[in-house]
From Swiss-Prot:
It comes from the Bacteria. PROSITE patterns: PRD_1, PRD_2. GO terms for biological process: positive regulation of DNA-templated transcription. Keywords: Activator, Phosphoprotein, Repeat, RNA-binding, Transcription, Transcription regulation. Mediates positive regulation of the glucanase operon (licST) by functioning as an antiterminator factor of transcription. Prevents termination at terminator lic-t. Phosphorylated. This is Transcription antiterminator LicT.
Length: 277
């Protein structure tokens, strides 16, 4: 295997037999090496296969100045997230998370930690991702010796959510705000506190995440037949009253009309989550 390009002493790019470019990492892998030299395969620690060419180029550019410890811990966090969630994450996370962690470490060392305005919401709306974020802080500490604050666990969690939904970070922030707004409408309509450990709460939050994503992408859940909605309106009339409040709010604030199916599923989820409150 030949070196296609030397990125830094620890990172190179190569082209495999299928003609696909790979980013290869290992300590001292490219020391005193140049394009066309043989790769010292014994030094290879990690191979990145990024299918998106634009992401691959951004990743290589980023790696020119990033310490190898930062690259290693970012890859460790991403692999852990994939394992815990059982999901494929968008390749863009290799750029966004590595860049974020590098600057978070630099800021911390200068005493310039940033407060996370969405920490409370992130803890409650993205529990699995926040748990990964907390574990990521341990990984960063073990790899670099830097203790990042809990706020960073929240930021890392949002980067993971971003990669799950294939969204840009500003959209993730807006999605999170809409989820919290809807939960507040339900909470104050019924004057309840949610049982955040219940399965129905978890399912409701998951539904809201994709509902909010459709809202900002300008897409709708297709409507089938109003018969089911009519049945649910009659059976769960209090939950439907709450759904109508949500509908009014969404149409007023975001100019997004809810379909019959969206009203149906919101009502069913609200009925279930309120029963377990």
């Amino acid at each position: 295997m030949k070196i296609a390009k030397v990125i830094n002493n620890n990172v190179i790019s190569v082209v495999n037999e299928q003609g696909k470019e790979l980013v290869v990492m290992g300590r001292g892998l490219a020391f005193q090496k140049k394009s066309g030299d043989d790769v010292d395969e014994a030094r290879i620690e990690k191979v990145f296969t990024l299918d998106n060419k634009d992401v691959s180029e951004k990743f290589k550019t980023l790696l020119y100045d990033i310490p190898i410890e930062c690259m290693e811990v970012s890859e460790e966090i991403i692999s852990y997230a994939k394992l815990q969630l059982g999901k494929k994450l968008n390749d863009s996370i290799y750029v966004s998370l590595t860049d974020h962690i590098n600057f978070a470490i630099q800021r911390n060392q200068k005493g310039l930690d940033i407060k996370n305005a969405l920490l409370w919401e992130t803890k409650r709306l993205y529990k699995d991702e926040f748990a990964i974020g907390k574990e990521a802080l341990v990984m960063v500490k073990n790899k670099t010796g830097v203790s990042l604050p809990e706020d960073e666990a929240g930021f890392i969690a949002l980067h993971i959510v971003n990669a799950e939904l294939n969204e840009e970070m500003p959209n993730i922030i807006n999605i999170t705000k809409v989820m919290q707004e809807i939960l507040s409408i339900v909470k104050y309509h019924f004057k309840i506190e949610f049982n955040e450990e219940s399965l129905h709460y978890y399912r409701f939050v998951t539904h809201l995440k994709f509902f909010a994503q459709r809202l900002f992408n300008g897409t709708h859940m297709e409507s089938q037949d109003d018969f089911l909605l009519d049945t649910v309106k009659e059976k769960y009339h209090r939950a439907y009253e709450c759904t109508k409040k949500i509908q009014t709010y969404i149409e007023r604030e975001y100019e997004h009309k809810l379909t019959s199916d969206e009203l149906l599923y919101l009502t069913i989820h609200i009925e279930r989550v309120v029963k377990q409150a």
